[in-house]
């Protein structure tokens, strides 16, 4: 079971469901590896301007953050098995879930009740 309060989410890749987590540290590593800001990366995926290497890097960091032991070869095989379109969709969902600021929504709800 995942813990959304810790930023964990489940991602279904083919017939398997994995725990994933992108921390600030992993987001910085992704930006460094791809030489692209995380928001620009998310926009590019939304506009179908995505490279397979981008999918591989984001998935590798997310899967490792969820406690899975994956290397580029294994992540590449998953992408090959499920297809680029499905992989792009799952990476987009993962980034949206990570970048979405749910805490501010909770603060707004608390203030409205006061």
Residue ranges: model-predicted function:
Residues 1-17, 35-50, 67-114:
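Charged interaction scaffolds used for protein-protein
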Residues 21-22:
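Short linear motifs in exposed loops
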Residues 56-64, 90-93:
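Short, hydrophobic/amphipathic alpha-helical patches that form generic packing surfaces
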């Amino acid at each position: 079971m995942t813990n959304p309060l810790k930023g964990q989410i489940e991602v279904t890749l083919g017939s398997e469901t994995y725990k994933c987590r992108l921390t600030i540290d992993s987001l910085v590593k992704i930006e460094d590896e791809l030489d692209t800001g995380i928001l620009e990366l998310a926009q590019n995926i939304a506009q179908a301007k995505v490279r397979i290497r981008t999918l591989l890097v984001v998935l590798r960091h997310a899967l490792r953050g969820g406690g899975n032991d994956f290397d580029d070869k294994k992540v590449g095989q998953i992408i090959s098995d499920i297809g680029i379109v499905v992989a792009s969709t799952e990476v987009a969902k993962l980034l949206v879930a990570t970048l979405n600021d749910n805490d501010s929504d909770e603060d707004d709800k608390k203030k409205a009740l006061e």
